[in-house]
Regions:
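An acidic-aromatic
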Residues: 71-130
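Conserved helix-turn-beta segment immediately C-terminal to the redox Cys motif
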Residues: 289-290, 305
Length: 307
C-alpha cells in the first residue's frame, strides 16, 4: 500500500513538472512569435557594464536606438543605428548589414569598417536589444546544448533565466557562437542570460548577460514598433556633414618604426629615469660609454587591487 502511494506521488510530481515545462515552452514560443513580428523598433535603452563582484556599474550609457529586422544580413539579421539619448542627432554607432560606422567626435572623423581588415570567422557586431532577445529565446527552444531554464511569474512581468553549461562560453552574434577558449584557464565557462518580459505586450524590456569576466544589463523604455521598414533605413542619413570619412583600417596603420641597426651611431635623446633608490638619473649625468638600462613592469590585476 505504501509503495503504491509513493509511486502515485512520484507520478503526479512528474506530471506536474511536465505540465509546467510545457507551459513554459508554449509561453516562450508566444514571445518568440511576437519578436519575429517586429520589422522595426525605436526605443531608449540604458546599457550598464559590471565587473563580477562589484556593487556599482563600471559604465552606464543612455542611447536612442532605431532597430530594423534585416533578413538579408547573414551576421545578426538586423541593422540599427545608436544615437545619443540626450542628443538624437549625435551618432554613436551604426550597422547596415554591410558596414559598421564608428564616430570619433573629438577629431570629427567617421571610421567605416567593411570587415575586410583583420577578418574573423564571424563579424563581432553587438546585436540590438530585440534581435538579441529573439535569438536567446530561439536558442533556448531549439538547442541541443546543456541548458537549464526557469520561467517565473513576478506580477506585471515574467522572469526568464537561461543557464548554458558548455565547455565554452556562448555569445549571440545573431545565432549562438561557442567562443574559442583562451590559452589560459578562465575558470567557469557557464553563460547566463536573463530576460524580463512585460505581460502587457509579451515582449522583453530588460535583459542581463553574465559571464565569469563580465556582466551587462540593458533596459528599454518608450518602445514603438513597426512604424518603418528596412527600406526606410540609410546609414548615410546619420553621418555628420562636417566629418571626415576614413577607412577603419587607416586608424591602425603604424608609422614605420626605426630598427635597431638604424639607431647605431645616432645621438640618444635626453632622458631622466629613476634608479632603484627612486633618485632621478639623467643621461647627461652618465659618463660611461655604455649604459645598461633595466626596465621593470609590475601589473596589478583587478582582484589583487580590490583585495
Amino acid at each position: 500500500m505504501k509503495i503504491k502511494l509513493l509511486l502515485t506521488i512520484l507520478l503526479l510530481a512528474e506530471i506536474i513538472t511536465a505540465n509546467a515545462q510545457n507551459a513554459e515552452k508554449e509561453y516562450l514560443k508566444k514571445v518568440l512569435t511576437n519578436l519575429e513580428k517586429i520589422e522595426s523598433a525605436t526605443y531608449y535603452v540604458t546599457n550598464e557594464s559590471w565587473q563580477p563582484g562589484d556593487s556599482t556599474a563600471l559604465s552606464t550609457l543612455h542611447s536612442f536606438i532605431k532597430e530594423y529586422d534585416n533578413p538579408m544580413d547573414s551576421t545578426i539579421g538586423a541593422s540599427y543605428v545608436s544615437l545619443d539619448a540626450n542628443d538624437t542627432t549625435k551618432l554613436e554607432f551604426c550597422y547596415d548589414g554591410n558596414i559598421r560606422v564608428l564616430p570619433y567626435h573629438e577629431n570629427k572623423k567617421l571610421a567605416i569598417d567593411d570587415f575586410t581588415f583583420r577578418p574573423l570567422p564571424f563579424r563581432l557586431v553587438s546585436p540590438p536589444f530585440f534581435n538579441h532577445a529573439k535569438n536567446i529565446i530561439r536558442y533556448a527552444l531549439t538547442t541541443k546544448d546543456h541548458i537549464a531554464t526557469e520561467l517565473k511569474d513576478e506580477g506585471d512581468n515574467y522572469y526568464f533565466k537561461l543557464v548554458i553549461d558548455e565547455n565554452q562560453q556562448v555569445e549571440f552574434f545573431g545565432k549562438a557562437y561557442h567562443m574559442p577558449l583562451p590559452p589560459f584557464d578562465i575558470g567557469s565557462t557557464t553563460s547566463i542570460y536573463e530576460l524580463w518580459i512585460n505581460k502587457s505586450n509579451d515582449l522583453p524590456y530588460k535583459k542581463r548577460r553574465e559571464m565569469l569576466h563580465d556582466i551587462s544589463v540593458s533596459t528599454c523604455s518608450n518602445l514603438a514598433i513597426n512604424r518603418h521598414t528596412i527600406y526606410d533605413f540609410n546609414a548615410s542619413d546619420y553621418f555628420p556633414k562636417d566629418y571626415e570619412i576614413v577607412k577603419y583600417s587607416d586608424l591602425y596603420k603604424k608609422k614605420a618604426e626605426p630598427t635597431a641597426s638604424s639607431l647605431i651611431g645616432k645621438k640618444a635623446p635626453g632622458w631622466i629615469l629613476e634608479n632603484i633608490e627612486a633618485q632621478p638619473v639623467s643621461l647627461a649625468d652618465c659618463k660611461s660609454k655604455i649604459i645598461l638600462i633595466n626596465l621593470s613592469l609590475i601589473h596589478i590585476s583587478e582582484p589583487t587591487r580590490r583585495s
